[in-house]
A protein has these predicted regions:
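Metal-centered catalytic cores of metalloenzymes
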Residues: 4-9, 28-36, 44, 162-164
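A structured beta-alpha segment of the ubiquitous adenosine-cofactor-binding alpha/beta core
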Residues: 1-27
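Adenosine-phosphate binding glycine-rich loop
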Residues: 17, 30-154
Length: 166
């Protein structure tokens, strides 16, 4: 913050993975000036909102931590599943399951962003896609719970049938 640290170097891809707000607007400006093409968060909110907007508006492909950082949570869930079933998976089995989960996350956020034409700086807005996909998942779970009283649904059986406006 302020001194740029690792963000001062010319790179194609930047991966902020440490502390919250570690990549600020000045760092973002330096990355853009040095030609960065993509920033992918590997932690919870390591990029300030101002820096995120600057990167996106300047054509940098930005993938936020909601999606990109989901691997840690997914692996924890796999470990809990493995432990509850008293199983012992190999590294390759866990890695394969995690790969499938991450591919599904990417497909979901990419699809959501495309369905709502969410782009910024000429790139797919994966931050918006992750927010939309997460919202739809919550809506679908809520709808599943409401089937006991369908008059609240107005005919919708999934989030895809609701009129969601952004």
């Amino acid at each position: 913050n302020g001194e740029h640290g690792v963000w001062q170097y010319k790179v194609d891809l930047a991966l902020p993975c440490a502390t919250q707000n570690e990549l600020d607007i000045e760092d973002a400006k330096m990355l853009v000036a040095n030609g960065v093409t993509s920033v992918t968060e590997g932690a919870n909110m390591p990029t300030t909102l101002e820096a995120t907007k600057y990167l996106q508006e300047n054509g940098v492909l930005f993938v936020g931590g909601k999606a990109a950082n989901a691997g840690g949570v997914a692996t924890s869930a796999l470990e809990m599943s493995q432990n509850s079933e008293r199983l012992s998976w190999t590294f390759e089995e866990v890695d394969g399951k995690l790969k499938g989960i991450m591919e599904t996350i990417y497909a979901n956020i990419s699809d959501a962003a495309k369905r709502y034409n969410m782009t910024v700086g000429g790139n797919t807005d994966y931050v918006a896609g992750a927010n939309i996909a997460g919202f739809e998942k919550v809506v679908d779970a809520m709808l599943a719970q409401v089937f006991a009283n369908p008059k609240h649904l107005a005919g919708a059986t999934s989030s895809n049938q609701l009129d969601i406006r952004l």
